[in-house]
Amino acid sequence: MATTMEQEICAHSMTFEECPKCSALQYRNGFYLLKYDEEWYPEELLTDGEDDVFDPDLDIEVVFETQGNSTSSDKNNSSSEGNEGVIINNFYSNQYQNSIDLSANATGSDPPKTYGQFSNLLSGAVNAFSNMLPLLADQNTEEMENLSDRVSQDTAGNTVTNTQSTVGRLVGYGTVHDGEHPASCADTASEKILAVERYYTFKVNDWTSTQKPFEYIRIPLPHVLSGEDGGVFGAALRRHYLVKTGWRVQVQCNASQFHAGSLLVFMAPEYPTLDVFAMDNKWSKDNLPNGTRTQANRKGPFAMDHQNFWQWTLYPHQFLNLRTNTTVDLEVPYVNIAPTSSWTQHASWTLVIAVVAPLTYSTGASTSLDITASIQPVRPVFNGLRHEVLSRQSPIPVTIREHAGTWYSTLPDSTVPIYGKTPVAPANYMVGEYKDFLEIAQIPTFIGNKVPNAVPYIEASNTAVKTQPLAVYQVTLSCSCLANTFLAALSRNFAQYRGSLVYTFVFTGTAMMKGKFLIAYTPPGAGKPTSRDQAMQATYAIWDLGLNSSYSFTVPFISPTHFRMVGTDLVNITNADGWVTVWQLTPLTYPPGCPTSAKILTMVSAGKDFSLKMPISPAPWSPQGVENAEKGVTENTDATADFVAQPVYLPENQTKVAFFYDRSSPIGAFTVKSGSLESGFAPFSNQACPNSVILTPGPQFDPAYDQLRPQRLTEIWGNGNEETSEVFPLKTKQDYSFCLFSPFVYYKCDLEVTLSPHTSGNHGLLVRWCPTGTPNKPTTQVLHEVSSLSEGRTPQVYSAGPGTSNQISFVVPYNSPLSVLPAVWYNGHKRFDNTGYLGIAPNSDFGTLFFAGTKPDIKFTVYLRYKNMRVFCPRPTVFFPWPTSGDKIDMTPRAGVLMLE
């Protein structure tokens, strides 16, 4: 009897149903969309019917259920929005009044190609976050002969890279660069030059045992290829004003099977580098990862070029673990604040190679390993001219506010726009957008061991002590060891959480080492386990070292309450949830010539069912020793719950980006000059309260010089110039909550502005808004007895007398010529001569406000609220000071830090 098509054998010696190529839903540019999980995989991985990649484990998968109300037809001028949970009456019969995204009108009809669901963040052929999946050509070769047999070959132009120990290529943000022309350029582009798209290989540096954890080397792109070593690409780069390109990178480090250690290799957008955009010639490490200082005698909480290396895994990355692989492959698309880049002023991508587990070896082995890098520009497009489109303006309809007389920082609606229907620069070229913080909370970041002298690993040896665990972690988000994980950084902005936690361990010993470990979770109530036998009475797993060097241990959510507190003042049943302990089950075994110990990287992430609720202000940043350490033991807690892990999904969550930032935050206090309602505007300041402000969440106004005019800064400054633990209150003006937690490189939104006077009374207040780049300064008075802020077509708002409300509120549309704005740091200069501040992009704000009034004693607070917020490309948050032994970070009453003794 004839067989069906599913039972027939295809050209790949498999049935059509089992063959990933023949059953693929789609093929495009060397990638297959596989049927079984609807994820994209590169063709080079689908070469052998016995490969594990045909049926890989999906270790990290974001499952989002429908949240809030679904969209419906617009009847009677109303819209239903699930995040805010209310019905908003739309008085203007227009669903988007503040700014109009022109992305659909930009050059090119095809949308950006993404590869999978979670792949739109940090994905690719291999899940590199919690499982280094071997791409075995012959499994027996590795298991029986201890030889790597994971072959990968890539051809670019007349160059070929080949490796026999690959872990696959990671495609950053799940998107490859398409080579489309930028919509901002009208000239004919230079592209598709075969001699340009090739690998350029060079030595990076030597790796020795002297390098400590988190020492790094930075390689800014494209500048490392802009010289003679860049060949034809460098020549084309030097002859063009603008370039738009993706990057493909392979980093190699050949070591023997008797070497141990691990490197973290990642590609980071807008990563701080040297002013000259040159590759580091030696290994470096920031002593305090809270940003660099431009002047040694000025102190403050942190600078805007901060980098928290405990969260570097938020960037597209792979581990070069000498036990598993000797090469890593990364590919990233083009990202920038504009559709193309002025490369002489800006390095949008930086390749960073960092040590996470130091190099170890035995006597007689090679003491130094060479690190080399092969870099290929992917489909570069060169342009020389720029084309800009003028913006249109339209009048604003006026209506009475339905909540007149009252103002709430979280009122779930939009106020009157100061400009309506304002076109904005297209951003359809951008990739790496995420809409829920849980997407990146599921990316493992490093746990600090041996706090306060923290390291990202624990150590195992050839002895197994039953009463001495390798690690003990409290199952609470306020545990001191988690202080610099992204999971804890995100959670500090919320009051309560629910769901499981995932602890990930990566063994970095030599390839010749074997051993077993026991990982246990013990609920509270009976104290933490003091021996391995006690730990085995609870939930545990045995990890056997093999080809897979990593293990993920999920801690189930077991609680007497539906939600648990993120922070803690005193340990109780609503915040602490037991311990995770790691024990050595058997001693490490190895042949002669191997090191006698090995390091295990430790990371944590959110589980699939993890959720947070009730956004709050983040905790103060500076450390204060005010309270003794907590024991971390709770009493009278029922520890007899079922340990079988069950998902605890919620139908909705409050971690969506648009919802989280849709609330007002203050940027500082301001004042007016007496009698300025009837005269020309003049810069003025009273008690560090100026009469103008740039609309941006970043810092401005230099307190050391008592500036009268607003000026963007790259650092946040406090009350004095002395370096003390107490730097508050801040003298610079900024949205401190935004600066403290903005885990993204770029953002785009409209801005709701609210002015709230400190006192009521009979006074007049005039506010003039100048869009970004407005050339005129409102200083010259043209009309007699009329303020210079009132003249012309520039939008203005006037309030006189006490009325029914003291607040002034309006929405400013996104009006920068940039397609997106840098959230924290711009790794470039404004000017062609590369002078001035490094870190502030040109016109990267929402304009400027000028104030005039009748009385000099009027003071008011300016609030910013981010409407229609979109964010792109995850990045680390601010470094959180490790608690010292016997102390904890004072975060009362919002959050606390538990210490282990």
From Swiss-Prot:
GO terms for molecular function: structural molecule activity; zinc ion binding. A zinc finger (unnamed) spans 10-22. The record marks A137, D138, Q393, S394, Q624, G625 as: Cleavage. InterPro entries: Capsid_VP4_Picornavir (IPR015031), Capsid_VP4_sf_Picornavirus (IPR037080), Leader_pept_picornaV (IPR021573), Picornavirus_capsid (IPR001676), Rhv-like (IPR033703), Viral_coat (IPR029053), Viral_lead_polypep_zc_finger (IPR037243). One of its GO terms (biological process) is virion attachment to host cell. Keywords: Capsid protein, Host cytoplasm, Host-virus interaction, Lipoprotein, Metal-binding, Myristate, T=pseudo3 icosahedral capsid protein, Viral attachment to host cell, Virion, Virus entry into host cell, Zinc, Zinc-finger. CDD domains: rhv_like. GO terms for cellular component: host cell cytoplasm; T=pseudo3 icosahedral viral capsid. Gene3D superfamilies: 2.60.120.20, Capsid protein VP4 superfamily, Picornavirus. RNA binds at C22, L46, T47, D48, G49, E50, N69, S70, S93, Q95, Q97, I100. It holds the Pfam family Rhv. A lipid is attached at G68 (N-myristoyl glycine). Belongs to the picornaviruses polyprotein family. This is Genome polyprotein. It comes from Mengo encephalomyocarditis virus (strain 37A).
